[in-house]
Amino acid sequence: MPLVMEEFGYPRDGFSFSTSSTTEARDRYYKYVFSLVGDNAASGGYFAGCNFWGWGGFANPKHEQWQVGDDYTGDPAQEAQGLNSVFSTDKSTLDVVKTQVDRMKNIGK
């Protein structure tokens, strides 16, 4: 019975909504959660993967609260736009995610 750790997230540094803000605290948190999932999977536990919250991709939030015509981010319309989103420009976070993807792909080979 495999389990997936899902919908964990962490705001951008300083609770900023800007896509140019740093993500150092988020990166540390993701590394921690990924280590728990990866260590459990590597030791034969039930975790098979994880899903972070949430993918903002190429969105460019124009307002703190979503308005008609704004890009959709990983944050739902009723929440602050960009706060928990991982954008395509968040290189350090994407590097953390890639490291976890590579680790999980190698577990069980």
Q: Can you describe what each PLM-predicted range is?
A:
Residues 15-32, 36-109:
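Aromatic-rich peripheral "rim/lid" segments of glycoside hydrolase catalytic domains that contact
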Residues 4-7:
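Active-site neighborhood of phospho(di)ester-bond hydrolases with catalytic His/Asp-centered motifs
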Residues 11-13:
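Active-site environment of divalent metal-dependent phosphoester hydrolases
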